[in-house]
From Swiss-Prot:
Organism whose genome encodes this protein: Pseudis paradoxa
Organism lineage string: Eukaryota, Metazoa, Chordata, Craniata, Vertebrata
Keywords assigned: Amphibian defense peptide, Antibiotic, Antimicrobial, Fungicide, Immunity, Innate immunity, Secreted
GO BP: defense response to bacterium; defense response to fungus; innate immune response; killing of cells of another organism; xenobiotic metabolic process
Cellular localization per UniProt: Secreted
This protein's record includes keyword Secreted: yes
Record function comment: Possesses antifungal activity against C.albicans and is also active against E.coli and S.aureus.
Name of the protein this chain belongs to: Pseudin-1
Length: 24
């Protein structure tokens, strides 16, 4: 349900943060 979607977006957000850190 909605909780799973929240977790997916949280994981996506973390991945984006890691990618941004790696690019800099």
């Amino acid at each position: 349900g909605l909780n799973t979607l929240k977790k997916v977006f949280q994981g996506l957000h973390e991945a984006i943060k890691l990618i941004n850190n790696h690019v800099q």
